[in-house]
Amino acid sequence: MMLAQVNSIAFRLFGIPVYWYAIIIVSGIALAVWLSSREAVRVGLKEDDVFDFMLWGLPAAIVGARLYYVAFQWQDYVDNPIEIFFTRNGGLAIYGGLIGGGLALFFFTRHRFISTWTFLDIAAPSVILAQAIGRWGNFMNHEAYGPATTRQFLENLHLPTFIIDNMNINGTYHQPTFLYESVWNVLGFIVLVLLRKKPHFLKEGEVFLGYIIWYSFCLLYTSP
């Protein structure tokens, strides 16, 4: 059977490969920033508060995501640690990015005298949507798949053929946990936006708490 394997390289720029992973991750971040800036204005902050935070948060999130990934895949780097600095092929962990970005957010809001909880409420729906988008970067990189399964099981889910084909990793089919998480996070985005539109029912920080609860249920199912 001929499998339709996706190419992780989108195109080459002056001979340098540009990966779908990077394009998708950056697209998710850009959308999250835009949505957060609109919400910031709605609650009385400035767009610049969001854009300025990105100068703090984005580097911290990237470093956190990389360190988290390397820490749990150290056997891949122990013999060639210089590879730690190369991320074009992927190797970023969402959880580490959230930790790094969260630390940056704490110090940024203290510096700007902005409520940390308000900022978290602003960001939470956008972040979970960016995570939903980012999981497709993992798919293009042949990452974030789950336990072994059968092709028949995947076909019974009525998934598109290109997804089924690309869940064949080294001859074994796997659960598309990237897809499960992506769909779950899109639903989470909708729920959090609806909650945010009911401020009289919620206290400061409870939209963010909703994000934590929603995403925790996702991890219970998709994490090994």
Residue ranges, per PLM feature:
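A feature for loop-to-transmembrane-helix boundaries and adjacent hydrophobic helices
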Residues: 1-223
